[in-house]
Regions:
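Conserved positions in beta-strands of structured domains
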Residues: 66, 209-211, 249, 271, ...
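Surface-exposed, glycine-biased beta-strand/turn segments
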Residues: 136-231, 263, 272, 276, ...
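Surface-exposed, beta-sheet-biased, low-hydrophobicity segments with strongly acidic/polar composition
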Residues: 27-161
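Extracellular/lumenal mature domains of secreted and surface-exposed proteins
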Residues: 299-504
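N-terminal secretory signal peptides that target proteins for export/translocation
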Residues: 1-7
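Short, surface-exposed secondary-structure boundary micro-motifs
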Residues: 213-216, 266, 272, 379, ...
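Bacterial N-terminal signal peptides
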Residues: 10-23
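Short histidine-centered loop motifs in beta-beta connectors
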Residues: 196-204, 236-264
Length: 504
């Protein structure tokens, strides 16, 4: 281990590192022999600092961090957007850090900015990224995959954006965590995939060695990101990267420390155990040595996007995330520009709002006068007529009564793939920040509404905390199911799900 650490330190020059991998045995035994080299090259820079990097194909790129601007809200003083201006091979480009952004191609490289220093301040997760400078940049050659093909798969057996998600640098919100009085922000650093508790299979994203499973841990990994917990698995791959799978409803019996797993092999079931906040989801993150020499997060959004594309070949993906938080009466800009089509440009953006009005365009501005959790629908259409939907979450709080926060709501369904007319679909819902009222479902097919009642997150880990119902769609189509619940002040939380039913 000491030899491994000294090698890493020798590679750190002005905070720059090609994050080379090592075989499983090296972490425990001290071997420095590379096994699988990541395709990404990483640089941590202060404003005004530059570096020349060698990319994985042998080419070089010179980068300089010119500027960093971080925008904070006036509700929690949380960073809502960070923009770096970077000079790449003599040309300047601005990049938004994470929050559902993908690498961009510019000046013969692909580049992104996964983290900036503002996300580490007043954060309750300390320095999960291992960043000691102003910002981190990641580079790949133009046209390169982001992850070596055949070495990484999507870790949850459900469709893309099946329900709520919390990706990197987004303050956690699904379980009602966006409270004005709470200035200690949990900027999410991993990837949260919401799903139906106890139903969605979780698979190993890579081949790897199980280092910990539940409370059991292999010896020799004290200097590592591994932190055993009853609902957590850590797997080490041949890049020397650690993969964490958290909040599992069940861990498969064979998943024991020292066991090797294959990419795509089922290792557990999605749940809400551990520090889930009470909403059912898979927390997935990747950690590796960073240019600082510290263990830190390797941002995974681009990797899961690429993996899902390879496995499922979607023609179009609507993206209206991340969520928004605003005072009542303030304007909010809804943004679907991160939507994607295999055809190229999106031709139409059509918005349908909770108040029954509508608008068109990739960005729209809205003002909300009443507190609540809104869930605005965007439909995107490309030149081939392919369509997809996503939903923009807007949490609105009364500035005169900031302690009277509105309810929030999480819904999920299963299965999400290969649905046919007549198939039974399970729908689950749980509300947060209220125990008044009931949830009311409208399945979007003209059938009668269904009323259920969750526990309002009274007991976080209650196996019956989600209210459960089932529904069958009679005909093929693309349906938008809606569920809502109000609190004692009449403030409502609304969410939507997109369900695609195909011909038999």
């Amino acid at each position: 281990m000491l030899h491994f650490q000294s090698l890493l330190k020798s590679l750190m020059v002005v905070g720059i590192s090609l994050l080379s991998g090592v075989p499983f045995e090296s972490i425990a035994l001290g071997s420095a022999r590379p096994a699988q080299t990541p395709l990404v090259t990483v640089a941590d820079l202060d404003v005004g600092e530059s570096a020349t990097l060698k990319l994985h194909d042998g080419t070089q790129a010179t980068v300089k961090l010119l500027d960093l601007k971080e925008t904070r809200d006036d509700i929690r003083n949380a960073v809502r957007q960070a923009v770096v201006t970077v000079e790449v091979n003599g040309k300047s480009v601005s990049l938004v850090s994470c929050t559902y952004r993908l690498p961009v191609t510019f000046a013969n490289v692909q580049i992104d900015c996964p983290i900036t220093k503002g996300y580490l301040q007043k954060s309750n997760k300390e320095n999960a990224w291992g960043l000691t400078k102003d910002a981190r940049l990641r580079l790949w050659p133009a046209g390169s995959p982001w992850m070596e093909p055949g070495t990484f798969v999507y870790p949850a057996k459900q469709c893309w954006f099946a329900t709520d998600t919390q990706m990197a640098n987004v303050p956690t919100f699904v379980d009602g965590g966006e409270v004005p009085a709470n200035k200690n922000i949990y900027y999410h650093y991993g990837l949260d995939f919401g799903g139906a508790e106890g139903m969605v299979d979780v698979v190993a994203a890579t081949d790897g060695l199980v280092v910990s499973s539940g409370l059991e841990k292999l010896p020799g990994y004290d200097d590592s990101p591994v932190a055993p917990r009853y609902d957590v698995i850590y797997i080490l791959d041949e890049r020397g990267w650690f993969y964490r799978y958290s909040h599992l409803y069940k861990i498969e019996d064979f998943v024991k420390p020292g066991q090797r797993v294959k990419m795509g092999q089922k290792i557990g079931v999605l749940g809400k155990e551990g520090g889930s906040g009470g909403w059912s989801h898979l927390h997935f993150d990747i950690s590796c040595r960073q240019p600082s020499g510290l263990w830190g997060i390797q941002s995974g959004y681009a990797f899961i996007w690429e993996a899902y594309q390879r496995e499922h070949h979607p023609e179009i993906i609507a993206v209206a995330r991340p969520h928004h938080v605003a005072w009542a009466g303030d304007a909010v800009e809804l943004d679907a520009t991160r939507s994607w089509s295999r055809e190229g440009a999106i031709e139409k953006f059509e918005w349908t709002f909770c108040d029954g009005t509508s608008a068109t365009g990739p960005r729209v501005r809205r003002t909300y006068d009443k507190p609540g959790e809104y869930n605005e629908i965007v439909k995107v259409t490309d030149a081939s007529g392919d369509i997809d939907y996503d939903f923009a979450v807007v949490q609105v709080i009364d500035k005169n009564h900031p302690d009277q926060v509105p309810p929030t709501i999480h819904a999920a369904y299963y299965p999400t793939f290969d649905l046919k007319p007549g198939d039974e679909i399970t729908f689950k819902v749980r509300s947060f920040r209220t125990r008044e009222g009931s949830e009311v479902w409208d399945f979007g097919d003209g059938s009668p509404k269904v009323t259920v009642q969750s526990d309002g997150n009274a007991k976080v880990h209650d196996p019956n905390g989600y209210a459960v119902t089932t529904h069958r769609y009679k005909t093929p189509g693309r349906y938008i199911a809606t569920v809502r619940r109000s609190n004692e002040r009449g403030h409502e939380a609304i969410t939507h799900l997109q369900i695609v039913v195909s011909h038999r």
